[in-house]
């Protein structure tokens, strides 16, 4: 029988936010501590007690799955006819999962490093996870990240020191692969298809855009071939109008705001403490009194989790130049710090 702690280990290996995992554990009334191993040590007794072990094991699996689906994602949403979504779900259930892939074999657990190094770069569908109102197709791939590490100046051997001299400090640069867990989520009742991408805090916008385009291509080509609908992702939601909605609505905390003025001023305001709201800052408030219209181009806002612990966040990122567009479009969201589907749906409702 699989050890339920393997699901927590998998989240740690994937470098999922420990803070978010800890909040999820609290929301399931499980014990926590100050780090991964200390927390595991506190959970082990719960898995040994006759009256708590089954509920604890089920909670660990659910936490893993919901964190994989919803924690720290780049999100793009498409309006699609509900009938077409149902047709697509039927077709994808039969033929979209790549059952022969190296990612599929041990899913949902990440590959060992030696396996990951040999794995192909392209994105494949490794599994289908169905929830009550949506079908999730789990997309796996690998991507390399570049890390810089400071090394002691005496790390060079004698020959290298002779060739290059003595250094006070050395910088080592290393590329390593990480396994990504992206999601294509089909919600027929809502008439929506969502693509949620992993790695929002690890990769730049260009890297993420390339991966988004590849998944869009895979879904569109599959839909064209299997249900005769070539442009199924043709209608993307525009989140630019939601910036004003988020700013004007009194709930939550606006932690960051980017805006421009009629006098060509460009401002990016950020509060030092997460509990402080940009809108209540005296400097910001004085500025809004002085300008006719606050022309915002980006915003980050968070709320207390409906589950009790955590602060799920929506960020609408954009360059200031979009504020001068005649018909501005932002089709990307960052949905951060969610510990569950409840958190994710709660914050997404704020922009839809």
Language-model features: where?
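Intrinsically disordered, low-complexity, charge-rich terminal extensions
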Residues: 1-352
């Amino acid at each position: 029988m699989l050890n339920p702690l393997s699901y927590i280990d998998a989240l740690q290996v994937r470098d999922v936010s420990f803070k978010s995992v800890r909040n999820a554990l609290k929301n399931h009334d499980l014990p926590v501590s100050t780090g991964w191993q200390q927390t595991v040590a506190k959970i082990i007794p719960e898995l040994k007690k006759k009256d708590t072990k089954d509920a604890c094991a089920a909670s660990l699996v659910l936490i893993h799955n919901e964190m994989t689906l919803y924690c720290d994602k780049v999100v793009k949403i498409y309006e699609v006819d509900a009938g077409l979504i149902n047709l697509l779900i039927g077709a994808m259930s039969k033929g979209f999962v790549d059952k022969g892939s190296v990612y599929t074999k041990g899913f949902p657990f990440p590959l060992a490093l030696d396996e990951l190094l040999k794995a192909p770069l392209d994105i494949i569908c490794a599994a289908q996870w169905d929830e009550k109102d949506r079908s999730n197709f789990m997309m796996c791939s690998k991507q390399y990240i570049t890390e810089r590490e400071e090394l002691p100046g005496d790390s060079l051997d004698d020959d290298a020191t002779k060739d290059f001299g003595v250094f006070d400090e050395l910088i080592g640069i290393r590329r390593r692969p990480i396994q990504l867990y992206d999601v294509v989520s089909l919600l027929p009742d809502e008439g929506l298809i969502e693509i949620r991408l992993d790695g929002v805090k690890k990769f730049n916008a260009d890297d993420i855009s390339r991966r988004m385009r590849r998944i869009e291509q895979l879904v569109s080509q599959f839909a064209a071939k299997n249900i005769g609908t070539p442009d199924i992702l043709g209608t993307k939601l525009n989140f630019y109008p939601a910036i004003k909605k988020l700013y004007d609505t009194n709930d939550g905390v606006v932690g960051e705001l980017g805006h421009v003025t009629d006098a060509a001023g460009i401002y990016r305001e950020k509060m030092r403490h997460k509990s402080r709201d940009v809108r209540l800052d005296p400097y910001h408030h004085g500025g809004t009194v002085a300008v006719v219209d606050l022309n915002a181009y980006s915003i980050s806002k968070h709320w207390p989790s409906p589950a009790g612990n955590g602060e799920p966040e929506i960020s609408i990122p954009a360059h200031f130049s979009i504020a001068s567009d005649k018909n501005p479009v932002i089709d990307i969201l960052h949905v951060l710090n969610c510990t569950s589907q409840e958190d994710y749906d709660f914050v997404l409702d704020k922009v839809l």
